[in-house]
A protein has these predicted regions:
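Single conserved hydrophobic/aromatic residue that forms the stacking wall/gate
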Residues: 1-12
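Glycine-rich tight-turn/loop motif centered on a GG-T
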Residues: 25-36, 98, 102
């Protein structure tokens, strides 16, 4: 069990350098990042299959904060757990993409409360606002709440703190 626990604590990242990878592929870095999609998806799928975190590669164009923001939003949408950084000025931007919004936190709280109520009544599946709420939806809601907690977005009672 300790090996399994240790594996879960490890993280996998786009350890092949994006610069090395694009050179090996006989291409180079483009603003839209399309040249990295295959490698990103392979890393992400391998991490998910192993049950460990996945972090994207470094964004090397320090003169393009808008490009960094777009890329960070993209990798968040793909499902990466975070982004590798070499510049501390990028931390706030990554956090702004990954921190749940007030609406996401409120929705997650409602999902968790509703499924708990359903569990008490002996039901495993419910509907909220016309959407089915089952285990995957609950797991996503729990992840939102975990992210909110580690981002210090909740007070002691679990209420969202406005920044």
């Amino acid at each position: 069990h300790s090996l399994r626990r240790r594996q879960r604590q490890m993280c996998i990242r786009d350890s092949l350098s994006a610069e090395d990878y694009t050179t090996d592929m006989k291409t180079h870095r483009y603003p839209d990042g399309a040249e990295l999609e295959f490698a990103r998806n392979m890393v992400l799928h391998a991490a998910r299959a192993a049950g460990i975190a996945a972090f994207d590669t470094v964004f090397t164009n320090m003169a393009d904060p808008d490009g960094f923001y777009r890329e960070t939003r993209h990798i968040h949408q793909l499902g990466f757990d975070g982004k590798s950084l070499v510049n501390p000025r990028q931390i706030a931007m990554v956090n702004s993409v990954y921190e749940p919004t007030k609406d996401e936190v409120i929705k997650a709280q409602k999902v968790i409360a509703a499924i708990e109520e359903a569990r008490i009544k002996g039901s495993g599946v419910i509907s909220m606002n016309g959407q089915m709420v089952d285990r995957p939806v609950v797991l996503r809601a729990q992840r939102v709440m975990s992210l909110a907690k580690v981002s210090n977005l909740l007070d002691e009672e679990g209420n969202y703190i406005e920044k």
